[in-house]
């Protein structure tokens, strides 16, 4: 008669193997507690790793997207939600989407390139070129972001004098433009601090956008639909983009807040590069009275 195959013994959890290796042999109850502890720790760790690639959580401190998203500087009443980082791997952002992206809030110099124009005019490490509150000025134009700074340099004709006034109020004459297309070409090196913003995507690369009489026009056609039923402000003298017909460069996006009168957005600082797109809000978790799919 064939002997029944013996059931293979279950291997103990790794944590039990470790403690036994060091001479501790816990009883049944403690062993079960240690096994469950290992399961929970591994599950939480894997979830954290997966979530870091799939989603991120965001709190909103301002009312720039009100009433779609509520903000509060104290964060006690501010909307808090999870952001889907996967969707835009399968489709491109499109006008009307609510988009989370990284935005420059401080551009600060590192030591300039040795022998460069930046070193010769005395630019030193640690100076704020621009912040989200105070722009730099290039060719008389207020610029808040790396994109806007380099766009301005690239747009100037050869022979143009390059004068930089930083957020700290210092003015530097970097000479005349020859073949330079970025401020870094003059020997300025910087580090950029970014934070997450949430706005509504209005126009994509290749489209022309204009705000007129409270409405938005894309390639001459007025945007219609519930997502665009807001009164868009265009009368502030500080606005530089979208007031006249403005072409959005390929690979960039033009973003506005739904609460146009209280939004620091693309009208001030221009365009968001594709590399700075984070994802789409999908689940509001705070406050509990507004919990749900966005």
Name these PLM-found stretches:
Residues 82, 164-165:
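Glycine-rich repeat segments that build the extracellular carbohydrate-interaction surface of secreted
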Residues 167-169:
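Glycine-centered tight beta-turn/hairpin loop motif at sheet-sheet or coil-to-beta transitions
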Residues 115:
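Acyl-donor binding region in acyl/amide transferases
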Residues 2-41, 49, 53-59, 67-111, ...:
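Soluble "head" domains of membrane/secretory-pathway proteins
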Residues 160-162:
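Exposed beta-strand face motif in extracellular beta-rich ectodomains
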Residues 62:
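A short acidic/basic microdomain associated with nuclease active sites
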